[in-house]
Amino acid sequence: MDLHRAPWKSSAAAAVLLLALFSGAAASSVEKNLAACLRDNDYDQLLQTVQDGLPHINTSNHVVIVGAGVAGLTAAKLLQDAGHRVTIVEANSRIGGRVETYRNKEEGWYADLGAMRIPSDHSIFRWFAKTLGVKLNPFIMDDHNTFYFVNGLLKRTYTVEANPDILNYKVRSSEKGKSANTLFQDALQKVKDEVEAHGCRAALMKYDKYSAKEYLKEVAGLSSEALRMIGDLLNEQSLMYTALSEMIYDQADVNDNVQYDEVTGGTDLFPRAFLSVLDVPILLNSKVQRIRRSRDGVTVSFKESQRSSLTDLHADMVLVTTTAKAALYMDFEPSLSIRKMEALRAVHYDSSTKIILTFSSRFWEEDGIRGGKSITDRPSRYIYYPSHTFPANSSVGVLLASYTWSDDSLLLQAASDEELKEMALRDLVKIHGERVRALCTGVVVKKWSLDPYSFGAFALFTPYQHLEYAKELFRSEGRVHFAGEHTAFPHAWMESAMKSAIRAATNINKQTLLNEGMNECPAPDEL
C-alpha cells in the first residue's frame, strides 16, 4: 500500500486530474520531470500537519469514522488531538483493514496477508512508525541468487542481469540486450518528452486514455515479445488493460532500485500501535448500513453482529474510510450525488491473492537466497523469500510461494486452499527441486477479491478514470467526508491511505472552525 500532491480546491475544475497523478514541477532532466509528475506537491504540508497537529477546536464536535483501517486510525488520531470527539465503527472483528497478519502463535511464526513493505520515501508512514514505537527492518526486494523460470528455462537472477537475452524472448534486434525494465523506461520516452515540452497536465490529457498495452504497442512501438517480456518479468501481464498511469506508478514504487523496509514482527503491529495513543471508542463487529444527513448533523446506523436491530449514532460529521465498493453497501439518505455514485460503482478494483506455504526448514538458504523474489510465467508468478526469521521458531520456513494480481489472481479464486498448495508446490519443485515437496507442512491463502469487508485488493484505474473519477472519489457531500487509498495516489499503499486521511481530517477541522465563526469563507475540499 506513495504520491506527493498539492491541495486542489473544489473550485479548480481545470485541475480535475492534476489531482496527483501528473502535477508538475520543473526538473533538471526529462526523467526528473516525469518523476515530479508522480509526486504530491502538498506532501511536505501533510507531513508538517501530522508533526504539528491540526488547529484545536473550542466546541464539542462529534465525528464518526466508518472503518478502522490505516486511514480511519490516522484521521482519528488527528481529530482526537484537535479536540474532536471521535467514534470509530468497524464491521470486522479486528482493526487494520487491508493490513492483516496471520499469526500462528503455537508454532511461533506469522505472515503478512496484506500490506508487507514500505518504500524508503514514505516519510509520513515512517514518522508515525517512529512516533508509535513501531520498529522496521530491511525488506530485501532483490537477491541475485534467486531464479527466473520462464519460457521453460531456469536461470539465476545474476545471469539474467548480465544477459537478458538468455531468457529467449524473441525480441527485435533493436530490443536485444535490454532488461524488461530498460525496455519499459525507454518506451516512456514519448511521455517524458510531452511532460518536458508541455507539462504534466498536457501529458495526462494526452495519455490517460491509453491502456498500458495500447501505449506500449501503438505509441512506443514495442514488439509483441518485448510486451510479453515486460508483462512476465515486471509482473504486469495481467495489468496491461489498466491505465498507463497506473503502470508508471507501479514501476516507480515497486522495482529493484527502490529501498524498502518491513514492520518487524508483522505489519499489523502498525495499526495496533494506534491503540496506545487513541482514547476513542472503537466499535468492532458493527456494520454500518445507513448514513442519514440532516441540517443538524448525521445519524450513522449500524448492526452489531449479535443483534438484529440497528443502533444509531448521532454526530456532527462522518468520515467514510471503507473501500469504494464497501461504501456501496450503505444507504445514504439523502442519496449521494449521481457523480459520486457513478465513481464508487465504476472505479476499478484489482484482485490480489497470496499463497503462504510453511516448511520444516528454510531450504532456499541452501541456494544462497535471503530475501528477494523468483519470477515465473507459471501460475505462481512471483515467489517472495522472507527478509526475516522468527525468534520463537528458528527452524520454520515461511514462504510467500505465490503473489498474484489482477487476472493472474482471478485464476485462483475458485480453487481450494489444498489445490492452491499443490499448484504452488509444483512450481516450487521446478525451481528448487523435488526435495521441497516433503518439507512442506502447511498452507495459508488470502484472496482479497473474496474479502467480505474490502470486496477487492486496492483501486487500480482503467483508462479515463483518472480524469473522470479521481477528484470525485475524495469530494465530500455536506457532512459526509471520504478517505482511503482509492482517493489518493499511488493506489494500494498504506501511506496513500494516510495522506487521504490527513486531507479529510484537515477539511473536517476547517469546517468545524468555520462553524465556530473563526473563518469568514467556506473551506473547500482539499485533495
From Swiss-Prot:
Documented EC number(s): 1.4.3.2
Swiss-Prot/TrEMBL catalytic activity: an L-alpha-amino acid + O2 + H2O = a 2-oxocarboxylate + H2O2 + NH4(+)
Required co-factors: FAD
Alphabetized GO MF terms: L-amino-acid oxidase activity
Family under the similarity heading: Belongs to the flavin monoamine oxidase family. FIG1 subfamily.
Quaternary structure note: Homodimer.
A cellular component term, taken from the record's GO annotations: extracellular region
Disulphide bonds in the chain: 37-200
Location of the protein in the cell: Secreted
Expression by tissue: Expression mainly observed in plasma, spleen, kidney and gills with low levels detected in blood and no expression detected in brain, liver, heart, muscle or intestine (at protein level).
UniProt-annotated glycosylation sites, renumbered to this chain: 58, 393
Lineage: Eukaryota, Metazoa, Chordata, Craniata, Vertebrata
Positions of substrate binding: 117, 403, 492-493
Function as written in the Swiss-Prot or TrEMBL entry: Inhibits the growth of both Gram-negative and Gram-positive bacteria. Displays strong antibacterial activity towards V.cholerae and E.tarda. Causes deformation of the surface of S.aureus and the formation of pores on the surface of E.coli. Strong antiparasitic activity is seen towards C.irritans, T.brucei and I.multifiliis. Cilia of treated theronts are lost and the macronucleus swells, inducing cell membrane rupture and efflux of the cytoplasm.
Chief place of localization: secreted
Name of the protein in its database record: L-amino-acid oxidase
One BP annotation, GO: amino acid catabolic process
Highest taxon listed in the record's lineage: Eukaryota
Keywords associated with the record: Antibiotic, Antimicrobial, Disulfide bond, FAD, Flavoprotein, Glycoprotein, Immunity, Innate immunity, Oxidoreductase, Secreted, Signal
Signal peptide (residue range): 1-27
Binding site residues for FAD: 70-71, 90-91, 98, 114-117, 288, 485, 492-497
Enzyme class: oxidoreductase
